[in-house]
Amino acid sequence: MSLCHRNYMLAGLGTLIVILSGIASAETKYTVVAPPVCVNNLGESVSFFSRPTTQGRVAAGMANRDNDGNPVIYRANYEKATPAFQKFVDFHECAHHQVGHVDQPHPPRNSYDHLMNESIADCVAILRVREEDNESYRLVIDGLVDAMTAIGFPKTSTDSRISNVTNCYENYGSSAEFIEGVLNSERAR
């Protein structure tokens, strides 16, 4: 595993567990949804692996490359999140592969670049919700609010994230067009 991928994994894991959490009561168990189709910006199919833990109380995902360099998404504790929120997390993690974040050095946590990467992934994710599972939009928004509130994010952070997701959902074209715009912007750098 390259240093870039290792740093992405280590820095991203903590952030994604906190940012992408669907919290449910300890007794609530949901059916785990099948992962969506995910192909990265290099045309490689992304594999999903479940890694349930006995200690985790939140659902989380992490986009990375495995030790052999294959693109992967690790899913943890999905049975603790609603199916709608599970799909959003999968789409969000897939987006990190689709726009090439996984193959770039991971920016410092909470830096402008890190937050921009997360906003981009949220936007792609909600566009895919609109395209593939539109009836779950409200459930995704509710899941984000519930999770961020339960974790202790300030209301301003929650409101900002919901505003970004809603703006993407209401005002952008397809996820493919959005991804192409991000990739073109990266190429122009």
Regions found by a protein language model. Name each.
Residues S21-I23:
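N-terminal signal peptide c-region/cleavage motif recognized by signal peptidases
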